Amino acid sequence: MLPLKFHEGGLIPVIVQDQKTREVLMMAYANEEAVRLTESTGSAHYYSRSRKKIWKKGEESGHFQKVGRILVDCDEDCLIYEVEQTGAACHTGYRTCFYRTLDGVTIGEKIFDPEKVYGKTGH
């Protein structure tokens, strides 16, 4: 593995992209352990800054990300996970976390009701 440059708190930003459509699905953070777990298992793992723990995408929702390839940027301080997305990527129920324009117009497709999956609304 290349020598990654982790930012403050030992985290690196991860952009998640659909490996077929190239659609950007989400952005999250990973620590070194989460990156290694992702690399070794082929399932996307991230680090939750609010819960202060590693989490596997889909462990609660069933909407998993199978990682086909991990790309590293030129400065070695940002990653792209190219994934096969099962269901929605966003905890709000949308396929992608980027489902709104800057002026607030919803352009994305809602896949599930977060209240039914998590017992709470997405926001």
From Swiss-Prot:
Mg(2+) binds at D73, D75, D77. One of its GO terms (biological process) is L-histidine biosynthetic process. Pfam families: PRA-CH. One of its GO terms (molecular function) is magnesium ion binding. This is Phosphoribosyl-AMP cyclohydrolase. It is found in: Cytoplasm. InterPro entries: PRA-CH (IPR026660), PRib_AMP_CycHydrolase_dom (IPR002496), PRib_AMP_CycHydrolase_sf (IPR038019). Homodimer. It catalyses: 1-(5-phospho-beta-D-ribosyl)-5'-AMP + H2O = 1-(5-phospho-beta-D-ribosyl)-5-[(5-phospho-beta-D-ribosylamino)methylideneamino]imidazole-4-carboxamide. The lineage of its organism: Archaea, Methanobacteriati, Methanobacteriota, Stenosarchaea group, Methanomicrobia. HAMAP family: HisI (MF_01021). Catalyzes the hydrolysis of the adenine ring of phosphoribosyl-AMP. Pathway: Amino-acid biosynthesis; L-histidine biosynthesis; L-histidine from 5-phospho-alpha-D-ribose 1-diphosphate: step 3/9. Zn(2+) binds at C74, C90, C97. Belongs to the PRA-CH family. It is an enzyme of class 3 (hydrolase). Keywords: Amino-acid biosynthesis, Cytoplasm, Histidine biosynthesis, Hydrolase, Magnesium, Metal-binding, Zinc. GO terms for cellular component: cytoplasm. Binds 1 Mg(2+) ion per subunit. Binds 1 zinc ion per subunit. The keyword Cytoplasm applies.
